[in-house]
Amino acid sequence: MHDIRAIRENPAAFDAALARRGDSALSSQVLELDEARRAKILAAETAQADQNKAAKAIGAAKAKGDEAEFERLRAEVADKKAEVAAMQAEAKELDAKLTDMLARIPNSPAEDVPDGADEDDNVEVKRWGDVPAFDFDPKEHFEIAGVAKAMDFETAAKISGSRFVVLKGAVARIHRALAQFMVDTHVDENGLTEVNSPVLVRDEAMYGTDKLPKFGEDSYQTTNGWWLVPTSEVPLTYSVAGDVIDEAALPIRYTAHTLCFRSEAGSAGKDTSGMLRQHQFEKVEMVSIVHPETSDEEQKRMLGCAEGILEKLGIPYRTVVLCTGDMGFGARRTYDIEAWVPGQNTYREISSVSTTGDFQARRMNARFKPADGGKPEFLHTLNGSGLAVGRCLIAVLENGQQADGSVKLPDALAPYLGGKLTLTAEGQLA
């Protein structure tokens, strides 16, 4: 949510930020509605003052025994009361319209974000690891002999339809091991607090984390109004909604392993084979709630946490900073980490690490109390995948595949797999 005062003070800067995203100028529309709202509030306050003045005069007229004046003033008070109520209702309606308009306007990109139209204009900032050289044509994850029978899309389609998968046996265990490894690393080495959070949330939680009102079609809603979380960013971030947190308690760093649900609206025909794009998937999320002065440094720290998971697993990756035209609605700056996927001979996104600045905090009214006793200020919130578990499974399987259909698994998973680091061509751990 944008600060209306900042738009009033510098509408040109507001429009320039929208232009960098490829959006049309909106300051004139916003300020026109804001001015109408403020004028109606002022008119209501003036009418209220007139009502109060007339109400006080009633007593004096009654004391004087001036019955005619008493009746006139009483009628005036009744008229003013109705006028005030009508004006207040109009002001409330205008305020709701202004809030709705602001809620649909994307965050302003940071100054250092590269300008661009789409993913082709993203800028690579890091590349790690050597892409494996195979003496055979590498297969996609669902084609590898040791995986094929354990990754059951046919049964999933019978149960739920397209874009679902049933994992069985050793592959299901590897998937679980990856999630456990991620959470343990974030807690034991990166200092995050593990949270077991709900995956059903209220409208307010989706709104506060900028998923509503614009992106409701991308998520699933139950018949009684709850939303299935598209990411655990929603419950973790919204946990501080309405709070005023002591500065000394910052930063707050959370991690959670949850199911996530997305309708994938607009993705028809994309990644229809395999596990890359699913309606239901698992993700280990990182959320940081910090002082504004430390948010840029915190984003770098979170990025390092996500990259570190891939490095421990030995998965080659590259990191890109998204251009203005490819950033998410609520992001101020986003880094994508893309893992090497040999079966497609390319890098695929496995994590996004974003700072929203105070964009979400304003929607949630989440603030902190400065140590010097000053007025409460809005927090900064950040979120990042650490990592998408299914996509990490894909990267592990494809990068570790062997010519005989077996898969060599990363050493980092040994504690979670009983020391067995080979998935045989028959689909067993050995």
From Swiss-Prot:
- Where, subcellularly, is it found? Cytoplasm
Which GO cellular component terms, listed alphabetically, does the Swiss-Prot or TrEMBL entry include? cytoplasm
InterPro entries linked to this entry: aa-tRNA-synt_IIb, aa-tRNA-synth_II, aa-tRNA-synth_II/BPL/LPL, Ser-tRNA-ligase_type_1, Ser-tRNA-synth_1_N, SerRS_1_N_sf, SerRS_core, tRNA-bd_arm
Instruction: Name a biological process GO annotation.
Output: seryl-tRNA aminoacylation
* Entry binding sites for L-serine: 231-233, 285, 385
Task: Tell me yes or no: is Cell membrane among this UniProt entry's keywords.
Answer: no
Pfam families per record: Seryl_tRNA_N, tRNA-synt_2b
User: What does UniProt say about this protein's domains?
Assistant: Consists of two distinct domains, a catalytic core and a N-terminal extension that is involved in tRNA binding.
Q: What does this protein do?
A: Catalyzes the attachment of serine to tRNA(Ser). Is also able to aminoacylate tRNA(Sec) with serine, to form the misacylated tRNA L-seryl-tRNA(Sec), which will be further converted into selenocysteinyl-tRNA(Sec).
What's this protein's family per the entry?
A: Belongs to the class-II aminoacyl-tRNA synthetase family. Type-1 seryl-tRNA synthetase subfamily.
Looking up PANTHER family in the UniProt record yields: SERINE--TRNA LIGASE, SERYL-TRNA SYNTHETASE
Under the subunit heading, UniProt states: Homodimer. The tRNA molecule binds across the dimer.
| Record protein name field | Serine--tRNA ligase
Organism of origin is: Ruegeria sp. (strain TM1040)
